[in-house]
Amino acid sequence: MTDKKYIIALDQGTTSSRAVLLDHNANVVEIAQREFTQIYPRAGWVEHNPMEIWATQSSTLNEVVAKAGITSDEIAAIGITNQRETTIVWEKSTGTPVYNAIVWQCRRTADITDKLKADGHEEYIRNTTGLVVDPYFSGTKVKWILDNVEGAREKAERGELLFGTVDTWLVWKLTQGRVHVTDYTNASRTMLFNIHTKQWDDKMLEILNIPRSILPEVRNSSEIYGQTNIGGKGGVRIPVAGIAGDQQAALYGHLCVHAGQAKNTYGTGCFMLLHTGNKAITSKNGLLTTIACNAKGEPEYALEGSVFIAGASIQWLRDELKTVHDSFDSEYFAQKVTDSNGVYVVPAFTGLGAPYWDPYARGAIFGLSRGANCNHIVRATLQSIAYQTRDVLEAMQSDSGERLQYLRVDGGATNNNFLMQFQADILDVNVERPVVKEVTALGAAYLAGLATGFWKDLDELRDKARVERTFSPDSDNEKRERRYKGWKKAVKRSLEWAKEDEE
């Protein structure tokens, strides 16, 4: 216990940067949020400006302190959680990025991953890194930058460049270039990290021709990495004391810290993690084996299913189809009809993630009849999020041999009661929605707070956790299985759609 009153979690996401101020009871006191530009240079390419990421994130940090009317000497620590895999390479001496951040959604390196498969590296990558060979992960993005940005490879070989995922970039900027680190959870998403030895893997660096000198030091998710000054009275220096990739942070924020506990985060993408304790389970069903947070001692493991498009499909309804005015309208319009009228939406806008891993899949609407209307499409789009979650759960249960008893949920789309009820129905398990919705930020705050003595231990945190609503499934198993069978048929027809165009 300390005399400090607050923890700040920096939640650097795919579409916005947020700062969340929490008190000792793990209640959200204040939030500041700023969106930033999404850059689409070509079909399937997605970039961010690293300087804009930093500008929005640093401004929200200052803003949340100002909005709350507090001073920096009341803040115990800062925890960071971030969009994972997104790749930044910058000059060590100037801090200037050599290229835009290549975002996790970006598919530009599909040709590199195809070559990795053709060269027979799939099994080694799966066994060593826990990952499948896919453009999603950082390794091929780093290679692309070094191969395609003029002079980058030569600078990297001379030790003049640094690589980092977004957490590394933020810590570098917060500490004014003094600290170049990542944590185990983010390192495990690069395709460059051996999750068993917990070291950067020399063979992967050789395969992708990436110099070791650009890599950050890998540290635990809960420790003091450095300090930052955000002004205020006396300009007190505040410890940066927690780092976790967004999905692992959410798992920790739900206090899913034991084998068999699972959560699903409904953000831009949809991410389900099942904690597997100290056992790294190699999936036979297209899931990832990844590292989970542990505030004390060695990091542990989880199985993860990554769905690329979840909340982004609701944005698509709003921005491109213009069938809803804002994301909150989707629940209203989905309930204007009693069913989806046989319509299925497969939102494979950037390919399909787990358990299919097909970068050439594309989005499609199936089952349209003359009676289908916009409300059916809205309803089917929401249902697609729940169907994709079931795809992942089926794979998890097969790999782990365990039947899930409940699913803890977080993310913006969990405010949609229609979606949460349909999720419970299609999974046939209880879905638990917590009182504090900012679970990803909560996880980062917990990690930073435990590292600095703001909270004593997990037992203290468990006493603060509360469920706001439990959604229980309906008992109609025949309807559940009929609907899911239709989804599987729709997905099958979406696979490899773009492959011929790119050959």
From Swiss-Prot:
Entry binding sites for ADP: 14, 18, 268, 311, 412, 416
Gene from which the chain derives: glpK
Binding site for ATP: 14-16, 268, 311, 315, 412
UniProt-annotated binding residues for sn-glycerol 3-phosphate: 14, 84-85, 136, 246
Keyword Transferase: yes
Pfam family, one: FGGY_C
MF-aspect GO terms: ATP binding; glycerol kinase activity
Pathway noted in the entry: Polyol metabolism; glycerol degradation via glycerol kinase pathway; sn-glycerol 3-phosphate from glycerol: step 1/1
UniProt xrefs under Gene3D superfamilies: 3.30.420.40
Enzyme kind, highest EC tier: transferase
Annotated positions binding glycerol: 84-85, 136, 246-247
Protein name: Glycerol kinase
This enzyme's EC code(s): 2.7.1.30
Species in which this protein is naturally found: Haemophilus influenzae (strain 86-028NP)
